[in-house]
């Protein structure tokens, strides 16, 4: 457990260093491309993110659950190899379907710039699909940090170099875009080489495969695939609908603002990368005492860091956004609402992993489907009226409320947030007294959140001990 905590800390530092690099890149990127071009990239990546579901079809959950159960290294390597072959076959099918419906997509957006670049989705999809498949394979072997560094840090370092070159040589958007895709491809090659070195097997072992085993994987995979699809749609539908209703410029501003709000989400991503494979192993071995300890500790750590970041964004999100340009300051509420939604999500600790890798995995699909319906409905209602603020409200509301206790936690967070706004409105400048006052209130918020999560964890872990088992 200590080793995993160390890996989680390293992964979190990698993530936040990457966020810093990303903010620097975003700041300079606004000097070489317009908000409309940023919106174009966001829409291309959003469409790719939806298509990637059909390519991977639940492989993430399948690999974590079933590779962790295999004892033989040759069997694990064989399982990984078969997953890559299956993924590539699905990729070819998805590309054919995408080409068939390309005209419908272009008709929906009616944008000449998108028409010029839409076919770039094909190589982007291949690169992202292979990278994610390699990443999840390494996670199953508890080797997540290298993939995180490549995905989050190296690509941003190379991107920063590209931006400097673009500023110096005054590169066109087309050359900048092609160069960026080339950086993603280089990153993928490095990761695949690392995967080959770390998961080298002497021979393939297919002895674990049977018709019953295949049916079990297919049954589990279908539910997790649809759950993953719903999750992807939930995370992408806001950008897609903003692009069509508000325009590419609005999508560009929303994309910049959402980067800040999702900083809290990086905490949960680290938990998924590092601890979910362990959750799968502990459930398989029925090691509930270890699950209990992990559940309590992770929940506290997530809220401790998350609440600090949330408070910071409440006060300084507007100032941070104004760095990118006057128009971007309109994304203040996007940052705050998304940060609040992610903070609530962090409070659920490893609930998602426990549900997904237990016999109650169907619950994951049902809840995500309901949340998707809620998200799309609210987007249709709120975006025309409130623009990007309406989109983020719909997205924040649809972030997984895994348990009923979170409703109580949300109420307390909202009460605390109200006090913060009242205080902020009465402090004209941030002098030493104001900073001291904010620091004291921040300390009270931290203590309160930790108390609430401790109470909730005690209640929930008793339920998990009685109900959760591995199948």
PLM features: residue spans?
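Membrane-proximal transmembrane or re-entrant/amphipathic helices at the cytosolic face
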Residues: 419-471
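Hydrophobic alpha-helical transmembrane segments
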Residues: 43, 119, 150-165, 169-198, ...
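Interfacial segments at transmembrane-helix termini and the short loops linking adjacent helices
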Residues: 102-121, 313-343
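Helix-loop junctions and terminal segments of transmembrane helices
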Residues: 27, 56-71, 140, 200, ...
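Membrane-interface junctions at transmembrane-helix termini in multi-pass inner-membrane proteins
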Residues: 127-153, 339-370
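Signature of the first transmembrane helix
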Residues: 3-64, 91, 95-99, 124-125, ...
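N-terminal membrane topogenesis motif
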Residues: 1-22, 77, 81, 208-227, ...
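Interhelical loop/hinge segments that connect adjacent transmembrane helices in multipass membrane
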Residues: 1-4, 169, 173-179, 191-235, ...
């Amino acid at each position: 457990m200590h080793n995993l905590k160390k890996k989680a800390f390293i992964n979190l530092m990698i993530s936040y260093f990457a966020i810093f690099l990303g903010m620097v890149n975003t700041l300079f990127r606004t000097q070489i491309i317009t908000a409309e071009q940023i919106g174009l990239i966001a829409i291309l990546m959003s469409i790719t993110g939806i298509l990637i579901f059909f390519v991977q079809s639940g492989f993430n959950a399948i690999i974590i659950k079933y590779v962790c159960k295999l004892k033989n290294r040759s069997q694990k390597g064989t399982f990984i190899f078969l997953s890559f072959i299956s993924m590539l076959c699905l990729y070819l099918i998805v590309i054919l379907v995408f080409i068939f419906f390309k005209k419908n997509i272009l008709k929906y957006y009616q944008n000449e710039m998108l028409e010029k670049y839409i076919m770039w989705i094909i190589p982007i999809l291949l690169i992202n699909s292979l990278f994610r498949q390699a990443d999840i394979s390494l996670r199953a072997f508890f080797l997540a940090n290298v993939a995180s560094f490549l995905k989050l840090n190296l690509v941003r370092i190379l991107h920063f170099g590209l931006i400097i070159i673009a500023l110096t040589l005054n590169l066109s958007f087309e050359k900048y875009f092609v160069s960026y895709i080339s950086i993603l491809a280089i990153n993928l090659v490095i990761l695949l080489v690392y995967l080959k070195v770390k998961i080298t097997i002497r021979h393939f072992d297919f002895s674990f495969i049977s018709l019953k085993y295949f049916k079990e994987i297919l049954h589990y995979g279908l539910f997790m695939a649809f759950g993953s699809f719903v999750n992807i749609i939930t995370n992408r539908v806001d950008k897609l609908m903003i692009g069509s209703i508000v325009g590419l410029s609005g999508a560009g501003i929303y994309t910049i603002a959402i980067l800040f709000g999702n900083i809290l989400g990086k905490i949960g991503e680290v938990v998924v990368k590092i601890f979910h494979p362990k959750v799968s192993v502990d459930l398989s071995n029925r090691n509930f005492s270890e699950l209990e300890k992990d559940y309590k500790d992770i929940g506290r750590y997530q809220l401790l860091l998350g609440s600090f970041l949330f408070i910071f964004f409440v006060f300084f999100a507007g100032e941070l956004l104004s760095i990118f340009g006057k128009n971007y300051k309109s994304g203040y509420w996007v940052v705050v609402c998304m940060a609040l939604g992610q903070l609530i999500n962090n409070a659920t600790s490893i609930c998602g992993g426990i549900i997904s890798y237990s016999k109650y995995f169907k619950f994951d699909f049902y809840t995500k489907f309901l949340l998707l319906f809620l998200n799309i409905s609210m987007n249709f209602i709120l975006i025309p009226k409130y623009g990007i603020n309406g989109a983020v409200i719909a997205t924040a509301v649809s972030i997984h409320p895994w348990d009923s206790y979170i409703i109580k936690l949300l109420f307390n967070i909202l009460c605390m947030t109200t006090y913060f706004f009242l205080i902020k409105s009465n402090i004209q400048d941030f002098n030493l007294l104001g900073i001291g006052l904010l620091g004291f209130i921040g300390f009270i918020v931290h203590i309160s959140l930790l108390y609430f999560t401790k109470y909730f964890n005690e209640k929930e872990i008793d339920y998990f001990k009685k109900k959760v088992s591995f199948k």
